[in-house]
Amino acid sequence: MNLTRLQSGLVGLLLLPLLLIACTQDPKEQRYTKDYQTNFSALWTILDEGYCFFDDKLPASGDTTWSDLKAIYTPRVAQCQSEDEFFDLMVELMCHLKDGHVNLFAPFDVGGWDIRKGSRHCLDSRIRNLYLQPHMRRAGSIYYAPITYNDHTSDSIGYMVIPSFSSSISLVHLHAVFTRLAHCRGLIIDMRSNGGGLLSNADRLASVLIPSDTIVGYMSTKTGPGHQDFGPLKEIQLARAPISWQRPTVILVDRGTYSAANSLVAYVKGTTRHVLFMGDRTGGGGGLPRSSELPNGWWLRYSSSRMYDAQRQSIEGGIEPHIIQEQTEEATAKQQDALIERAIALLLKGNK
């Protein structure tokens, strides 16, 4: 990704609210207040002008629009008897967007959409951990080992578990992992329940897997208060890393694979041929979030920039894997992970 361009844009976004406050806003509007109608109006307006997925979530031609919801919720706000009740009502309103990046942060709670609704059962963390034993190592937030569990020692399959992108994964970490798995003829990267974090982690891991320097996606940023106010698509380019892994690979995903982890799936699926994805459709989260403060001091986070894959398709709704596979009762009874076992079988078949 062009980090210089992205950082410059972020600096501009940070400075713009300060300029607007200094030049246009009435100081009275900045006063702290717990008034429910005032805070509801602020929340609704912030999302109305800044949220980037109304066309997908609540289109103007749909049965219910964002303006319709304002009319529906205004009398309900007037009936709120407590701060907790008002908080829950605002979260209910936001959940109409079905976006895990739209969250409300109060001193007493955090609310938002549950990205796992309607998901397949794809992960038993306790069983997954068995496949890392007894030779597990850790490089940053990557847990890895050659698989020996369940009589797979001779198969020579490497296994990486990345439960989160919240901590930085450096090229030093990746070099350590791939050097120690260099003898493996195939690799499984487990991204199940990785809820995202630092987009730079997706960039670095993808740069190891892509075959060459390439465009892995596109981004479009909100440029005005209208629902259609967007700038042109900007390319997301990645350079192939000094470390490279081009052997057969299976990446495991589920509905918990979200945000930056979802971006990794988009980057790699659209640009590689040696990588298969297995599990369930990813959770999505194809919008870069930003935050705004409400008059009562609560913080509202929401998606403000839209991301697309290399084929210019939106990744907000999630990405379908090549192979649908869920954890089975039979596999659980045998203390086996059905996805890992199937991935091993595919990798062995592909190496024959």
Stretches found by the model and what they are:
Residues 1-30:
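Bacterial Sec-dependent N-terminal signal peptides
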Residues 8, 12, 139-142, 287:
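Short beta-strand-initiation
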Residues 17, 181-183, 243:
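Alpha-helix termination/capping residues and helix-transition junctions
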Residues 21, 185, 321-323:
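Short acidic (Asp/Glu) and glycine-rich catalytic loops that position anionic groups and cofactors
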Residues 23-220, 227-233, 248, 274, ...:
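Flexible, low-complexity junctional segments that flank or bridge functional domains
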Residues 200-334:
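Conserved acidic, small-residue-rich alpha-beta core segments centered on
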Residues 324-351:
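Extracytoplasmic/peripheral linker and loop segments enriched in polar/acidic and small residues
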